Amino acid sequence: MLLLADMDVVNQLVAGGQFRVVKEPLGFVKVLQWVFAIFAFATCGSYTGELRLSVECANKTESALNIEVEFEYPFRLHQVYFDAPSCVKGGTTKIFLVGDYSSSAEFFVTVAVFAFLYSMGALATYIFLQNKYRENNKGPMMDFLATAVFAFMWLVSSSAWAKGLSDVKMATDPENIIKEMPMCRQTGNTCKELRDPVTSGLNTSVVFGFLNLVLWVGNLWFVFKETGWAAPFMRAPPGAPEKQPAPGDAYGDAGYGQGPGGYGPQDSYGPQGGYQPDYGQPASGGGGGYGPQGDYGQQGYGQQGAPTSFSNQM
């Protein structure tokens, strides 16, 4: 019964989750951050390396032809030692490696682990607590600040670990170790390197560190848009103002029926001359025209209601 109740709770959470956010840039980048953080701390924190060298003494019976030296994370190399023949009366000497590079390595792994945990928590919040996340806009603002902090921490930790890795390679190079071995400086003794440590996994961890830096810096923009702070910068440009008619244009100050320049009625051919009949007045001179004594009627066209001569004949 308890198992069934737990399954019901899980089903309710899954049903109420907004998994579409994983397809959006905000959620998809969080998934990438989560995965890349795992690769970053796994490739560094689980590393174990080994180098091999040989010491051939003048007295062949005292030689050690296959000396194996193992080291691992967190690279406190000053605590790593191996026994090498002193080439004097069958004795041995403890040889310690040089350097302590645990600070940069542990800092890098710590940032990766916390980034992994934060990405997982933020992704769960996006899916199951979307309303709480957007309530009062506090969720996006806190998310933005945390993303900015992690981006800075990835920059610092990746740079520090890249320098630390370079020092680890120098300290575990068999040639450099041989230079510090007193028996190898004695005449008649021969020291050789047999195998360099494989550091490809550590190189990969540095690459993942800077990839995480790119992801977290890029995600700043998507989280910034969720805060609403970008709204004033994303407004549409204002529309162009309407063009006002210039004074004197058509339908403007001198509009229809408002004198010269408009479209009001004017005398035929203008006031300067030309043929200008007035259909409402008698024709001058008593002769022709369209007045009362014309051929087509007894009165001009200006007098409405008067029958024409044609209508009288009808």
UniProtKB/Swiss-Prot annotation:
Membrane side Vesicular: residue ranges: 50-107, 163-200
Glycosylation sites: 59
Compositionally biased region (Gly residues): 254-264, 283-303
Residue pairs linked by disulfide bridges in the UniProt entry: none
PROSITE patterns listed in its UniProt record: MARVEL, SYNAPTOP
Any GO CC annotation of this UniProt entry: perinuclear region of cytoplasm
Cleaved signal peptide residues: none
Topological relation to the membrane, as annotated: Multi-pass membrane protein
Transmembrane helix found in the keyword field: yes
Residues recorded with modification Phosphotyrosine: 81, 279, 296
Residues spanning the membrane: 26-49, 108-131, 139-162, 201-224
Domain MARVEL residue range list: 21-228
GO biological process: chemical synaptic transmission; endocytosis; modulation of chemical synaptic transmission; regulation of long-term neuronal synaptic plasticity; regulation of opioid receptor signaling pathway; regulation of short-term neuronal synaptic plasticity; regulation of synaptic vesicle priming
Modified residues (Phosphothreonine): 227
Membrane-side (Cytoplasmic) residue stretches: 1-25, 132-138, 225-314
Reported function: Possibly involved in structural functions as organizing other membrane components or in targeting the vesicles to the plasma membrane. Involved in the regulation of short-term and long-term synaptic plasticity.
Family: Belongs to the synaptophysin/synaptobrevin family.
Name this polypeptide is given: Synaptophysin
Originating organism: Mus musculus
